[in-house]
Amino acid sequence: MFGNPAMTGLHQFTMWEHYFTGSIYLVLGCVVFSLCGMCIIFLARQSPKPRRKYAILIHVLITAMAVNGGDPAHASSSIVGRWLYGSVGCQLMGFWGFFGGMSHIWMLFAFAMERYMAVCHREFYQQMPSVYYSIIVGLMYTFGTFWATMPLLGWASYGLEVHGTSCTINYSVSDESYQSYVFFLAIFSFIFPMVSGWYAISKAWSGLSAIPDAEKEKDKDILSEEQLTALAGAFILISLISWSGFGYVAIYSALTHGGAQLSHLRGHVPPIMSKTGCALFPLLIFLLTARSLPKSDTKKP
């Protein structure tokens, strides 16, 4: 058997199961980086009004790539069946995973709030200085950095996951430090941004009906206000589902002290869910933009 010898999971993966999960991480990483990269280039080449209309959406895609940034280390370690990059590498992967994940969730919150401003406070949004976007984006990354740094400073800690092929918050040590970290993070960096973001989107969606058709036509771009608002809502719903696996493992471990007894399968499902959710974002954008692109004339002479 392979995995973390310090863990006593109910089921430990065989060599072939590690090969299979390593291949999944490798494919997911390639798919997310390829699709998000193409989507970022596509959006960056547009000339919308206001000019920074797609700025936060682009950073949503950048943070989706960051969530998958550890896939090469995760995939190679899974294929071998053990962590390959030592204790320093473990701390770096834990930090990067939390930085990417928390920044991604907060960037979704910023995208939802931008949709609310774009629909419900149109005049201010149209004249909003570019520096506001820089401040908002920087603040979202600051929140991600804060939560990723705390385990390095002693509020909880990073360690090997139950399958022993990647590192994240050490849920096998459910002490008071871990419990307080998990509960504060769940409330202030998951429940709050997701619920607040959904409320903002619901207000924006209601406000769309008040925009005159002439204004909608004038503001029409590769992605309309309706499409962007629908994207923001879909992104939050996808994230609520795709990050629920990590939420379950973290809360379960905090309440039951059973993190060390998780099976290898239950240890792999949360990261696969979150990474798969990130792959859906650029697909939805391409689907909507494909419907907005002008159709070529295919009539025969």
Swiss-Prot record:
Positions of transmembrane segments: 18-43, 55-76, 95-120, 133-153, 181-208, 231-255, 265-289
InterPro entries attached to this UniProt entry: GPCR_opsins, GPCR_Rhodpsn, GPCR_Rhodpsn_7TM, Retinal_BS
Matches recorded under Pfam families: 7tm_1
Any one GO biological process: phototransduction
Expressed in which tissues: Mainly stored in myeloid bodies of the inner segments.
Any one Gene Ontology cellular component term annotated for this protein: membrane
Alphabetically ordered keywords of this record: Chromophore, G-protein coupled receptor, Glycoprotein, Membrane, Photoreceptor protein, Receptor, Retinal protein, Sensory transduction, Transducer, Transmembrane, Transmembrane helix, Vision
Localization per Swiss-Prot or TrEMBL: Membrane
Protein name per UniProt: Retinochrome
Organism: Todarodes pacificus (Japanese flying squid)
